[in-house]
Amino acid sequence: MISKIVKKIKQRKLIIRNMRDINSLIRTEVKIEQLQYMALNSDRPLIADECQLGSPVIVSLTTFSKKIHEVHLAIESIAQQSVRPDKIILWLDEDEFAMENIPSILIKQINRGLEVKFFSNIKSYKKIVPTLIIFPDSYIITIDDDVLYANNMIDILVKEQNRFPKMIIGHRGHRMTFDGANLPKPYKQWDYDV
């Protein structure tokens, strides 16, 4: 009798967990559709009308050929922030891209304030190194090309930067882990989202 009750409880927990997963997937798909619609149809600038802090807030990202047709969604999620950045810069590999082969949806975003720049292929460092060189006194937020950001991310980062002005502020990070010889383990073995 007790084992049947325990089994039923486990089944219900599994159903509830599956329902949460389905709800999460639906919310994500709805958000993607909304961002896609905005990217295709909006004339609203992606960036702030005027600098809101003492130094510009710059969102910097990079992508590559396999993700070039989806990166507009991450960019659009930044454009929908409660606090919009002063610049959004998409860095592309100068050997892989030219303005002539950029997808038309990114051209629409360029017309709304996106800046596309080209740099040598230094992998993911491309989203921070050239931006630091050109804008050393700015607040730089690096983002991933495959994440849809909550609409208050920049607001939270700016508030935390104001609280801790001499610190590097992160929205999400990973903790390096080390092996027995005190050498860093491979990236995939780090502690994620700490």
What are these regions (language model features)?
Residues 137-148:
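Short beta-strand-to-loop acidic/aromatic patch adjacent to the donor-nucleotide binding site
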Residues 59-61, 90, 142:
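Structural beta-sheet core signal
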Residues 131, 148-194:
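Conserved catalytic core of nucleotide-sugar-dependent glycosyltransferases
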Residues 2-80:
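N-proximal low-complexity "stem/linker" segments adjacent to membrane-targeting elements
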Residues 91-138:
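Active-site-proximal specificity loops/subdomain of glycosyltransferases
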Residues 56, 86-87, 139:
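Residues at the starts of beta-strands that form the adenosine-phosphate
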Residues 64-68, 95-97, 147-148, 176:
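Short acidic, S/G/P-rich loop/turn micro-motifs used as interaction or catalytic elements
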Residues 75-86, 94, 108:
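Short, acidic, metal-binding catalytic loop of nucleotide-sugar glycosyltransferases
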